[in-house]
Amino acid sequence: MARNKIALIGSGMIGGTLAHIAAREELGDVVLFDIAEGVAKGKALDIAEASPVFGKDSKLAGADDYAAIAGADVCIVTAGVPRKPGMSRDDLLGINLKVMKAVGEGIAKHAPDAFVICITNPLDAMVWALREFSGLPHNKVVGMAGVLDSARFRHFLADEFEVSVEDVTAFVMGGHGDTMVPLLRYSTIAGIPVPDMVKMGWSTDEKMDAIIDRTRKGGGEIVALLGTGSAFYAPAESAIDMAVSYLRDKKRILPCAAYLSGQFGQDDLYVGVPVVIGAGGVEKIVEIELNADEQTMFNNSVDSVKGLVSACKGLDPSLG
């Protein structure tokens, strides 16, 4: 049986980490693409030379020509400029929009049947633009943000309750930014709702509020600590989670920036919601019930995303 083909568009810190994980997990043969050809080829060769040590047979290659991604089953897009200290994700809009145009056209020409996962920021606007530029089906183009934001939320909750991260479930809705909506009411510790754990005296409402705030600012916290660049280990692991669910038809429920066509009262918009990912791509959107406060926060987050999409249309009239 032929191996899957994984195309990684962008060979920076996330792209290189993705390649390493994909090779170690033997998800398929890996192509690293980058306009800086030497970087893509160098990282591919470095990981390939490590493969005898970790004992896996995935083939790796690097390229600066989109023809190299031909026939890819999954494309993970990290191309673009990362954040620097003091920058918001939104500050990257103008630069990365041009990158999405080139990437979208490249995927449309060479890998039109791929499942496409976008990581480039500002995420919700970039995945929308990437879909527009590529013309691929909406269910085959999705943004990685919710899995990452939820992982951060889970980590902070596990730390606070002093339990294994394996026993913590949580998810975050809305745009990938400071208006994201971490949903405490839908978060559990081994099936016990987090608000009930608080009532039992395991923590306090004030500490939960602080964790929610830290989750919203989680990316910025790492940017400030690193000084140059942004997070790459957790984003890469999160995107691999999504790719595996697609390649193995696992039908996992994961929070992702998905296309809404009436769900949650929104239309023609990509924003973070829980979805089922299987062999058909985004197979279902899980339209959970939000209370009044949650709905207000979600609407506020959606408005922020709409503003970015409008800005994209202003920068590139072809998106109008």
From Swiss-Prot:
Pfam families in alphabetical order: Ldh_1_C, Ldh_1_N
UniProt binding sites for NAD(+): G10, S11, G12, M13, I14, G15, D34, N96, I119, T120, N121
Record keywords: NAD, Oxidoreductase, Tricarboxylic acid cycle
Active-site residues annotated for this sequence: H176 (proton acceptor)
Gene3D superfamilies: Lactate dehydrogenase/glycoside hydrolase, family 4, C-terminal, NAD(P)-binding Rossmann-like Domain
Coiled-coil regions, chain positions: none
Top-level EC class as recorded in UniProt: oxidoreductase
Keyword match NAD: yes
Catalytic activity: (S)-malate + NAD(+) = oxaloacetate + NADH + H(+)
Function in brief: Catalyzes the reversible oxidation of malate to oxaloacetate.
GO MF: L-lactate dehydrogenase activity; L-malate dehydrogenase (NAD+) activity
CDD domains, A to Z: LDH-like_MDH
EC number annotated for this UniProt entry: 1.1.1.37
Residues binding substrate, per UniProt: R83, R89, N121, R152
Protein name as it appears in the record: Malate dehydrogenase
Provenance organism: Maricaulis maris (strain MCS10)
KW Ligase (keyword) present: no
BP GO terms, sorted: lactate metabolic process; tricarboxylic acid cycle
UniProt-listed InterPro entries: L-lactate/malate_DH, Lactate/malate_DH_C, Lactate/malate_DH_N, Lactate_DH/Glyco_Ohase_4_C, Malate_DH_type3, NAD(P)-bd_dom_sf
